[in-house]
Amino acid sequence: MSHRAVWLPAGLTILLLGCRHQTEQYVLPDQVTDFSALYASNCAGCHGQDGRSGPARPLNDPLFLAVIGKERLRDVIANGVPGKAMPAFAQSAGGTLTDQQISIVASEVEARWSRPQEFVGVALPPYTAELGDAKHGAHVFRGYCARCHGEDGTGSAKGGSVVNPAYLALVSDQSLRTTVIAGRAGQGSPDWRSDEPGHAMSQQEISDVVAWLSAQRPLPGEMAKGGATAP
């Protein structure tokens, strides 16, 4: 018997074993239950590989997680934010993730990045609230925000514009409120407690400044007609 005759069945056996091994490792998309895999394929592109440094709201933010709460976080992941950049991921809402996968993502984000002990005894502002008084919000903005964003919100050497029409068209009123409350630590933006001890914003002031920011959003068609201002 030739060496070739011996190696042929042996090579075929190895090939078949390799194929079977690959088949056994394949997992259907709706059966993936590993958080790292789910996060990498669905969340990291906007929220960053480690929950930070992405274009969207950081998830690796204990204050944000404390304010939004577990149930609301799961709801946003499942149903998204209509009309904005956050899509719905639940299959029941047109997404690709099962209810089990939604729960895995939400619970693991909480388990890995929340720090509830840091907020014991802290009166956190409510995640949602009605818009307040925009006129008074202008005064609040000048007191808390103008130092970095300019008196009219168009920006300064310390911070960018928060009234850019393109920006306001992309974010919801809830997103504005979340940013006012939780800040953006990675960008040097303080939370509602301000960077001055004892000078925290009241719940009414939060609602008022969000109302003022919302009032700067152009009406449909105005941005296309007038053009977006530079940030």
Language-model features and meaning:
Residues 32, 36, 48, 52-78, ...:
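Gly/Gly-Pro-rich "capping" loops immediately C-terminal to redox-active cysteine motifs
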